[in-house]
């Protein structure tokens, strides 16, 4: 993949991400959950018209420039068929609303709109929008991270923050871990996996943690890690090992932190 591929991916998708985020925000609280048949869990089964509309807003602009890429889309919408998958080295991963059940419908915390472009199983370009918080983040490998306010702010450099006491945990992190962190003086909230991946870039938030509900954190759940890494975040497993950059490599825990001290606090709470 040439560097221009990731550049084109971001250029094409940035306005589409803003549109998808606007769709999700406009329909929030107005759409019912229509369970997908055959799904293994209630979380995987959750589906709204906002999911399908937001996904189409993302796929249609990509269908010409990236038609031959292998597409991994969360929903089975009509534009999925436009992608041939001939170039298996290039993978586009889309999640139009990450956290549909608990975070979009349930309001437990931030939900996200996400898209990533990978070559040889490593993300080269990534975008994550948080509609409720009003931010769009993007990054290209080796060129830093940027963010802008939704719907139409100007992009600026994004970096990790070192103020505040906020932490964002996925719903897979046990309540006991959250309570240990609160006892240490942190302000603990819950968020979808996409939001946790970029947690240290959010105002007042120092870090985030995920514990996979299945064997490993999904490829979708890793999209934001490129953005976090380019912004200077510390990214580890719950054991303190470097989190793998290969998007298919097994890893069932994730710690994302603004600095080494916050990473230690998160790891200690996970394994007291």
Locate each region found by the language model.
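N-terminal subdomain of lithium-sensitive/metallo-dependent phosphomonoesterases centered on the IMPase/IPPase/PAP
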Residues: 1-97
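Residue-level signal for inorganic ion chemistry
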Residues: 20, 24, 51, 62, ...
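Short, charged helix-to-loop "capping" segments that act as catalytic/coupling loops
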Residues: 37-41, 81, 98-112, 203-223
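Short coil/turn connectors at secondary-structure junctions
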Residues: 67, 87-89, 123, 164, ...
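Fold-independent oxyanion-binding glycine-rich loops
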Residues: 74-75, 96-97, 131, 171-172, ...
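DPxDG-like acidic metal-binding loop motif
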Residues: 83-146
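Short helix-loop capping/hinge motifs at secondary-structure junctions, enriched
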Residues: 144-147, 151-153, 261-265
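An extended, acidic
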Residues: 157-272
């Amino acid at each position: 993949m040439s560097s221009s591929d990731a550049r084109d991916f971001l250029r094409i998708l940035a306005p589409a991400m803003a549109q998808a985020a606007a769709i999700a925000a406009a329909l929030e609280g107005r759409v019912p959950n229509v369970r997908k048949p055959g799904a293994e869990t209630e979380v995987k089964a959750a589906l709204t018209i906002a999911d399908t509309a937001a996904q189409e807003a993302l796929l249609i602009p990509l269908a010409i420039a990236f038609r031959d890429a292998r597409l991994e889309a969360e929903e089975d919408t009509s534009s999925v068929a436009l992608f041939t998958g001939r170039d298996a080295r290039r993978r586009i991963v889309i999640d139009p609303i990450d956290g549909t059940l608990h975070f979009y419908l349930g309001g437990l915390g931030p939900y996200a709109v996400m898209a990533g472009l990978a070559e040889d199983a490593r993300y080269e370009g990534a975008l994550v929008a948080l509609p409720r918080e009003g931010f769009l983040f993007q990054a290209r490998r080796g060129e830093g991270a940027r963010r802008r306010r939704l719907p139409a702010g100007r992009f600026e450099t994004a970096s990790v923050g070192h103020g505040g006491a906020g932490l964002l945990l996925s719903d897979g992190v046990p309540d006991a871990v959250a309570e240990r962190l609160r006892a240490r003086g942190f302000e603990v909230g819950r968020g979808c996996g996409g939001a946790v991946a970029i947690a240290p870039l959010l105002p007042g938030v120092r870090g985030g943690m995920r514990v996979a509900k299945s064997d490993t954190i999904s490829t979708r759940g890793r999209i934001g890690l490129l953005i976090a890494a380019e912004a200077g975040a510390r990214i580890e497993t719950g054991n303190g090992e470097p989190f793998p950059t290969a998007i298919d490599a097994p890893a069932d825990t994730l710690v994302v932190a603004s600095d080494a001290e916050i990473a230690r606090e998160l790891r200690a709470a996970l394994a007291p």
